[in-house]
Amino acid sequence: MNWEIVIGLETHTQLSTDAKIFSGSSTRFGAAPNTQANVIDLALPGSLPVMNRGAAERAIRFGLAVGGKVAPRSVFARKNYFYPDLPKGYQISQYELPVVLGGSLSFFVGEQEKTVNLTRAHLEEDAGKSLHDDFALASGAPASGIDLNRAGTPLLEIVTEPEMRSAAEAVAYARALHSLVVWLGICDGNMQEGSFRCDANVSVRPVGQKEFGTRTEIKNVNSFRFLERAILFEARRQIELIEDGGTVVQETRLYDADRDETRSMRSKEDAHDYRYFPDPDLPPLVISPEWVEEVRANMPELPAALRERFQRDYGLSAYDAAQLSASRGLASYFEDVARALPAGQAKQAANWIMGEVTATLNREEKDIADAPVQAPALAALIGRIIDGTISNKIARDVFSAMWAGEHGGQPDAIIEARGLKQISDTGAIGAMIDEVLAANPAIVAEYRAGKQKAFNSLVGQIMKAAKGKANPQQVNELLKQKLEG
């Protein structure tokens, strides 16, 4: 039997406010435990929450970016459950009336464009953190600790429809969402610090079946690589369980990266288990049309609009435009390079940035802002390819030297110092071709007998004789003339 995976994601995005969502405590990461929790975060008697306007403004920004409906009136609700790091015994969230409804996000899986619809995005407070590893009492006895610094940190939980059908698609969506919230400036996107965490709802069903299977939820995955591995394992586990005659149980599971498996955490609750009801301590969140327009007026150019502009103004493919608009920094870098080149050469800039620049950044785990080769220097290097000073092959060597800081990272100085200028003199190239043809009569005969590979072999020998400096286009043209003349 053939199976189909059904995936929906819930993403907890920590909002980039200086203060918590309902208190004035700092949200700064890394402080000593329990030094950033005030009476509201500790749920001391008589303390009352006050809404952080900045958190609401960031939610509006997100809603506009995904084409969702920003609710003119949304309500905070108490989500009741017990956990040691939840001081109040409930979490302040939104249930029936969230701040954003609907919307969608488009992204690429490979070179295929996909769109996933969003169900909602709602504001809520984060819980504290339970500490188990390397934690003990003064006596040395093992124990668990509670750090409430994170309690009350503002979250925007973004929920998709169950429309993804592969782990690769889910990861591509998560990456696109991560890029968007960082682009908008509503989240720092630091996954290691827990700023961007995904819950994956996974089920399987026979291909062609309309009804969904029983889903499990994989909680708090904070790595794209782990997200893919967790979904793949869980889908495989469910399929094997069903094929062996078992039944999938609705439950919450955790992904164990060391064992590359998911394991049961608890039975999955339904909404009624949380006994949601409106929080009597918080008034409804009222968002006026004027406030929405004020936020809209201060929005940056969105990735979707930028992709369209890159295709229109620079003649890029939809895929190239999407790759280059993955972050604001990368998009700015591309535009700076493209604008410094002659008209019609933007594709050269795109190829270099998506190729050598991105590969080197990934290898060194750097961001585009930390690239040693600045946009003007890369444009100068590409310019030397365009004017025939060097070949693409030599340009890659020059780029490596620029990245290493040789001669101040200036391509012209590196080309001059290394003697890398391309040979474009037709007389000199013709003489080298004559020598290679005279030394390889058998290969010449093969070409004239119709073997195209023989031509490539001759080109290789000519380039070797020229130490890679001969203009490849001229070599090809002159060689063909001599062979067919």
UniProtKB/Swiss-Prot annotation:
State its Enzyme Commission number(s). Answer: 6.3.5.-
Protein name as catalogued? Aspartyl/glutamyl-tRNA(Asn/Gln) amidotransferase subunit B
Q: Which residues cross the membrane?
A: none
What is the scientific name of the source organism?
Bordetella petrii (strain ATCC BAA-461 / DSM 12804 / CCUG 43448)
Q: What is said about its interaction partners and assembly? A: Heterotrimer of A, B and C subunits.
Give the catalysed reaction(s), semicolon-separated: L-glutamyl-tRNA(Gln) + L-glutamine + ATP + H2O = L-glutaminyl-tRNA(Gln) + L-glutamate + ADP + phosphate + H(+); L-aspartyl-tRNA(Asn) + L-glutamine + ATP + H2O = L-asparaginyl-tRNA(Asn) + L-glutamate + ADP + phosphate + 2 H(+)
Q: Might you name a Gene Ontology BP term for this protein?
A: glutaminyl-tRNAGln biosynthesis via transamidation
| GO MF annotation terms | asparaginyl-tRNA synthase (glutamine-hydrolyzing) activity; ATP binding; glutaminyl-tRNA synthase (glutamine-hydrolyzing) activity
Gene symbol here is gatB
- Key word Protein biosynthesis present in the record? yes
InterPro entries attached to this UniProt entry? Asn/Gln-tRNA_amidoTrfase_suB/E (IPR017959), Asn/Gln-tRNA_Trfase_suB/E_cat (IPR006075), Asn/Gln_amidotransferase (IPR018027), Asn/Gln_tRNA_amidoTrase-B-like (IPR003789), GatB (IPR004413), GatB_C_1 (IPR042114), GatB_Yqey_C_2 (IPR023168), Gln-tRNA_amidoTrfase_suB_CS (IPR017958)
The UniProt entry's sequence similarity note says: Belongs to the GatB/GatE family. GatB subfamily.
Q: What does this protein do?
A: Allows the formation of correctly charged Asn-tRNA(Asn) or Gln-tRNA(Gln) through the transamidation of misacylated Asp-tRNA(Asn) or Glu-tRNA(Gln) in organisms which lack either or both of asparaginyl-tRNA or glutaminyl-tRNA synthetases. The reaction takes place in the presence of glutamine and ATP through an activated phospho-Asp-tRNA(Asn) or phospho-Glu-tRNA(Gln).
List keywords of the entry alphabetically.
ATP-binding, Ligase, Nucleotide-binding, Protein biosynthesis
